[in-house]
């Protein structure tokens, strides 16, 4: 499809977040053009597990966004759930030690205070949830709201639905610069031509910082590498998304070095997905078998039957990490006409639809469903000023 000369909004990025922005903007009646340097869902959305989680989030802005996104996945978008294999499987967080269970109990109380459905599980009852779980665990917590989608299908079908409302999608179309009028962004220059638009949304994931830099603004999104292992197809031996309680700490950590914690979940196809790892190594793509071995050993400690299961493959990708662990969502006052929707790290699939709806609201002058100030693009400027004071 030829590049349009004009659009109401250009969305940069055809992953899950960009697709959600396009869907809700088109639904609001805007003429939308989506551009991506590669294929649909070619970045983080193709290298993740498709998590829609509340369990791994501390009470605060990110959890509020997760709750809002849940209302959309389960409400307005529920009729399309079969398209992206929405599965409300629930999540089980397990503690190996009593001290860890005490911390999990306190976290669950804070989450419950803001409306999260969570059930504490004592050690004797863990196998009611997961019969094949290892013996000797100290306890856990079950989160019925945790869910999963097939992330590439979610991105592809959200874009297909957006197309049905008039949006256009242009892959292999790299943004090289912005059209400017003074400080304002008024369009994009791409490898395939120029699109004039009064609004541009930076939904470029791990490349969000590079896109922001083209506009002369700083959005410190960094790539954080992670691996996933995939087993041979099996009967249903893992019922829920199951992970060790230390995973929550790793998600919230700013440590740049390698961190691993066991995450195990089944899929509709019978394979089991095994994670997780986190490390900041730039865009270094090589596979480290030692990381995979560490992940496998920790997964076996949760589910001993995995010791005899064949791992068919592994894949890795880069999560768009922000230093304060909050995404960047909303208009950028430093470059009027530029919006951001990036920096969701490992939560982008789950948070995508809430992000898209919030972006569409601000694009159309409608009051957003929640306060966007914690996600403001310019917040990092004040943090730097405080650091240098």
Residue ranges of predicted features:
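Glycine-rich FAD pyrophosphate-binding loop
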Residues: 26-46
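Dinucleotide-binding Rossmann-like beta1-alpha1 core, especially the glycine-rich loop
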Residues: 49-129, 298-300
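Helical element adjacent to the flavin cofactor pocket in flavoenzyme catalytic cores
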Residues: 141-198
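Short beta-strand to alpha-helix junction loop
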Residues: 64, 94-103, 142-160, 286-291, ...
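Short hydrophobic core segments
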Residues: 10-12, 195-207, 356
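Active-site substrate-recognition segment that forms the wall
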Residues: 23-27, 52, 82-87, 184, ...
């Amino acid at each position: 499809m030829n590049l349009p000369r004009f659009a109401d909004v250009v969305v940069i990025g055809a992953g899950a977040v960009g697709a959600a922005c396009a869907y809700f903007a088109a639904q609001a009646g805007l003429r939308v053009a989506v551009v991506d340097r590669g294929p649909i869902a070619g970045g983080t959305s193709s290298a993740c597990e498709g998590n829609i989680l509340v369990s791994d989030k501390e009470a605060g802005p990110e959890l509020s966004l997760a709750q809002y996104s849940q209302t959309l996945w389960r409400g307005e978008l529920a009729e399309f759930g079969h398209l992206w294999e929405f599965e409300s499987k629930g999540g089980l967080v397990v503690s190996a030690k009593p001290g860890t269970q005490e911390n999990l109990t306190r976290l669950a109380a804070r989450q419950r205070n803001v409306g999260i459905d969570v059930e504490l599980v004592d050690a004797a009852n863990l196998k009611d949830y997961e019969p094949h779980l290892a013996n000797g665990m100290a306890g856990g917590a079950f989160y019925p709201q945790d869910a999963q989608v097939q992330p590439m299908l979610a991105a592809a079908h959200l874009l297909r639905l957006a197309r049905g409302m008039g949006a256009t999608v242009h892959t292999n179309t790299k943004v090289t610069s912005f059209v400017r009028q003074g400080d304002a962004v008024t369009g994009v220059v791409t490898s395939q031509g120029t699109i004039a638009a009064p609004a541009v949304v930076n939904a470029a994931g791990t490349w969000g910082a590079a896109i922001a830099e083209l506009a002369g603004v700083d959005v410190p999104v960094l790539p954080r590498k992670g691996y996933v292992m995939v087993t041979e197809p099996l009967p249903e031996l893992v019922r829920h998304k199951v992970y060790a309680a230390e995973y929550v700490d790793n998600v919230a950590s700013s440590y740049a070095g390698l961190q691993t914690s066991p995450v195990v979940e089944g899929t509709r196809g019978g394979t089991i997905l095994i994670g997780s790892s986190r490390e900041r190594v730039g865009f270094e793509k090589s596979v480290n078998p030692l990381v995979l071995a560490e992940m496998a050993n920790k997964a076996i400690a949760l589910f001993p039957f995995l010791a005899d299961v064949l791992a068919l493959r592994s894949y890795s990708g880069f999560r768009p990490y922000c230093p304060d662990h909050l995404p960047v969502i909303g208009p950028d006052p430093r470059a009027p006409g530029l919006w951001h929707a990036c920096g969701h790290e490992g939560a982008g699939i789950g948070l995508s639809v809430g992000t898209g709806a919030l972006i569409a609201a601000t694009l159309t002058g409608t009051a957003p469903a929640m306060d966007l100030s914690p996600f403001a693009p310019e917040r990092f400027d004040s943090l730097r000023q405080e650091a240098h004071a």
